[in-house]
Curated annotation (Swiss-Prot):
Active site residues per record: E127
Protein name listed in UniProt: 4-hydroxy-3-methylbut-2-enyl diphosphate reductase
Catalytic activity: isopentenyl diphosphate + 2 oxidized [2Fe-2S]-[ferredoxin] + H2O = (2E)-4-hydroxy-3-methylbut-2-enyl diphosphate + 2 reduced [2Fe-2S]-[ferredoxin] + 2 H(+); dimethylallyl diphosphate + 2 oxidized [2Fe-2S]-[ferredoxin] + H2O = (2E)-4-hydroxy-3-methylbut-2-enyl diphosphate + 2 reduced [2Fe-2S]-[ferredoxin] + 2 H(+)
Superkingdom per UniProt: Bacteria
Pathway the protein takes part in: Isoprenoid biosynthesis; dimethylallyl diphosphate biosynthesis; dimethylallyl diphosphate from (2E)-4-hydroxy-3-methylbutenyl diphosphate: step 1/1; Isoprenoid biosynthesis; isopentenyl diphosphate biosynthesis via DXP pathway; isopentenyl diphosphate from 1-deoxy-D-xylulose 5-phosphate: step 6/6
Pfam families found in the cross-reference section: LYTB
Gene: ispH
Organism: Alkaliphilus metalliredigens (strain QYMF)
Residues involved in [4Fe-4S] cluster binding: C12, C97, C191
């Protein structure tokens, strides 16, 4: 069996920054103050469990935190959430991905200039929810073509996109949204790491008999990788979270297997999968 590992796979810059920020806070916490993350730091259960073993616990809202430090997750949060944390005198540690922070700044700037905001992305994803919180939660969120029909004619509109959206989906939807106004400011805010991982996964999936995509089942960027691989290998793409999820009986029937991993997947999880397959 030959294994082909995607050139771009695993931790992205934003995720690595968030994890390093969290463990730095753990190391510097000499007074054993309470440390929390607002929502899962990243969409990876193994990393979240590791943080909990070091005394960093996940809370869903500021109302659940009375003291100590709160780490803002890589997906970012609304402007109002910062205000609530400040009101409670919490120590705010901002681990927002820099690329997400850039979107928040764009949205706030153009909203204050009188633009309506259109966010291309999943309205239920924490990144999109957080971004919407920088324009008073008044954005039009567009995930599919039918969502564009709900947007009225606008004087001026600013278009941004969730960092993990497929480029093809962004291009199609942004073109349609642009027809809603004569004054359009458009920003392709897809993270370059997302684009690299998607392109790399597509290339590998064209060269192998089966694809394994490693990443959290709730990870948006991992789900996008699965969808891309299934375009090439609809019946031979396997989404797993860890090595224990491998269907070794099915996989031993393939000659060439491709491997990629979501941006929230630690390298040690990838290594465990590779080792297990090489022992077949």
């Amino acid at each position: 069996m030959e294994l082909v590992i995607a050139k771009h796979a695993g931790f992205c810059f934003g995720v690595e920054k968030a994890i390093n920020t969290a463990f730095k806070e753990i190391k510097n916490n000499q007074k054993n103050n309470s440390i929390y993350t607002l929502g899962p730091l990243i969409h990876n259960n193994q990393v979240v469990s590791s943080l909990e073993s070091h005394g960093v616990y996940t809370k869903d809202s500021i109302s659940e935190i009375d003291d100590g430090s709160v780490i803002i997750r890589s997906h970012g949060v609304s402007k109002a959430t910062y205000g609530l944390a400040e009101e409670k005198n919490l120590n705010i540690i901002d681990a927002t991905c820099p690329f997400v922070k850039k979107i928040q700044n764009i949205v706030e700037e153009y909203f204050n200039k009188g633009y309506k905001i259109a966010i291309i992305g999943n309205p239920e994803h924490p990144e999109v929810i957080g971004i919407n919180g920088w324009c008073n939660n008044e954005a039009y969120t567009v995930q599919q073509i039918t969502d564009v029909d709900l947007i009225p004619k606008l004087d001026k509109v600013c278009i941004v996109v969730q960092t993990t959206m497929p480029i093809v989906q962004y291009e199609e939807l942004s073109t349609l949204i642009s027809t809603k106004s004569n004054q359009v400011e458009q920003f392709n805010t897809i993270c370059h790491a997302t684009k690299e991982r998607q392109e790399s996964a597509k290339l590998v999936s064209q060269e192998v008999d089966a694809m394994i995509v490693i990443g959290g089942y709730h990870s948006s960027n991992t789900q996008k990788l699965v969808a891309i691989c299934k375009e090439e290998k609809p019946l031979d793409t396997y989404h797993i979270e860890t090595v224990v999820d491998l269907d070794l009986e099915a996989l031993q029937n393939y000659n060439r297997i491709g491997i990629t991993a979501g941006a929230s997947t630690p390298i040690w999880i990838v290594d465990e999968v590779v080792k297990s397959l090489r022992n077949l």
